[in-house]
């Protein structure tokens, strides 16, 4: 009984100390003593009046990077944000502009102690970089990188665009380029309203791509890939783990969709190759040849016009094909364990439909 009362006393004593400590922390934070927001800085660098060869920016923190038309007839770059006193002094001393003014290369200095458990919380917030160029000034190369921060890039027209972040989100919108390379190691990636031949590398995180024009290649580790409104000659999506969704797309040559573990759902024009080791495949609005393969999962494909070759294979799963009423083909269907329903073959055509499943029903109907 004595031990029980002692335990209760110790518990309440600890609770009181915790409450007192919490109140102290709250009061300290309310006074602004624990949260360090840094000192505001606005810094501008003048560029050449001629075309700009390259702009390169690197930072540890979140950054918004955008283009605006210059209204004063000059080309220049503006950096705004809150920084520590030491970083502010260091930035003001930087000279990132090349001698001829056509190149800009900056790595924003960062103090290492963002959080000290016995000191302050450093909350400097987001940086903003604005590139002011006259209407007739052209920018060749743009590179934006961050080690552990989010990146948001908007409204640029360049020849080459490169952007990457190790652990942070990457967003790019309203960008036009000959080539665009984007990469995230751990973070979501979002691209919208872009005209470029684009390549995307992701480690883990969701990828959302909307209204892209140009050839597209996506290689990823784990995370879903959603593509809407793409217009491309060639498209390739290959991920280790995650679903692939392709909607309202026009791929005139070939769309290759591959996931080791996940479903594939696509609606696009052009040839399609789809493969999943473990997951269902559903294709709709198809207007060209299809090859679909899965080790374990159903395959459902709907065609809206005559095509020459359809090849479907699944080890374990049902197959259902929906064809136009005037579709003509020679049908070859086989299942080791399952029912088979196919139309009558037409011997006066070279079009072929080949469907194989080890275990599952096959249904082909017009």
Where are these regions (language model features)?
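Residue-level recognition of well-ordered beta-strand positions that form the cores
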Residues: 56-58, 66, 78-80, 107, ...
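Short linear S-[DN]-x-LW-Φ motif typified by the pepsin-like aspartic protease active-site region
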Residues: 31-109, 116-162, 170-173, 190, ...
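N-terminal targeting/secretion presequences
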Residues: 14, 18, 133, 157-162, ...
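Short, surface-exposed interaction patches in beta-rich subdomains
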Residues: 189-198, 204-366
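N-terminal Lys/Arg-rich, disordered targeting/topogenic segments
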Residues: 1-7
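Hydrophobic membrane-insertion alpha-helices, especially the h-region
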Residues: 11-27
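A mature extracytoplasmic/lumenal domain signature
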Residues: 59-61, 69-71, 81-83, 108-112, ...
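Long, intrinsically disordered low-complexity tandem-repeat regions enriched in serine/threonine/proline
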Residues: 143, 164-166, 171, 176, ...
């Amino acid at each position: 009984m004595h031990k029980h009362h002692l335990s209760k006393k110790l518990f309440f004593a600890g609770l009181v100390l915790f409450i007192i400590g919490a109140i102290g922390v709250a009061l300290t934070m309310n006074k602004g003593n624990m949260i360090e927001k840094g000192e505001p800085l606005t810094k501008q660098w003048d560029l050449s009046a001629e075309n700009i060869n390259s702009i390169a920016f690197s930072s540890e923190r979140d950054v918004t990077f955008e283009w605006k038309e210059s209204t004063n007839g000059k080309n220049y770059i503006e950096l705004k944000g809150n920084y520590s006193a030491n970083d502010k002094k260091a930035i003001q001393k930087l000279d990132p502009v090349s001698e001829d003014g056509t190149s800009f290369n900056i790595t924003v200095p960062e103090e290492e102690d963002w959080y000290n458990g016995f000191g302050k919380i450093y909350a400097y917030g987001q940086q903003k970089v604005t590139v002011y160029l006259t209407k007739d000034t052209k920018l060749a190369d743009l590179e934006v990188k961050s080690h552990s921060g989010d990146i948001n890039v908007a409204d640029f027209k360049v020849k080459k665009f490169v952007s990457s972040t190790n652990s942070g989100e990457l967003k790019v919108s309203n960008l036009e380029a000959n080539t665009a390379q984007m990469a995230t190691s751990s973070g979501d990636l979002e691209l919208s309203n872009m005209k470029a031949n684009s390549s995307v590398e992701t480690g883990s995180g969701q990828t959302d791509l909307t209204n892209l024009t140009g050839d597209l290649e996506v290689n990823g580790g784990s995370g879903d890939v959603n593509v809407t409104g793409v217009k491309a000659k060639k498209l390739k999506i290959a991920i280790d783990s995650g679903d692939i969704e392709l909607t309202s797309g026009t791929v005139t040559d070939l769309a290759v969709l591959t996931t080791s573990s996940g479903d594939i759902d696509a609606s696009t024009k052009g040839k399609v190759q789809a493969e999943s080791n473990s997951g269902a495949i559903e294709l709709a609005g198809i207007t060209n040849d299809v090859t679909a393969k899965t080790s374990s999962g159903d395959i459902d494909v709907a065609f809206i016009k005559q095509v020459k070759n359809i090849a479907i294979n699944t080890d374990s799963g049902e197959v259902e094909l929906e064809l136009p009423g005037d579709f003509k083909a020679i049908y070859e269907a086989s299942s080791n364990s399952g029912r088979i329903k196919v139309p009558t073959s037409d011997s006066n055509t070279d079009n072929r439909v080949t469907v194989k499943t080890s275990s599952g029903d096959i249904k082909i109907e017009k």
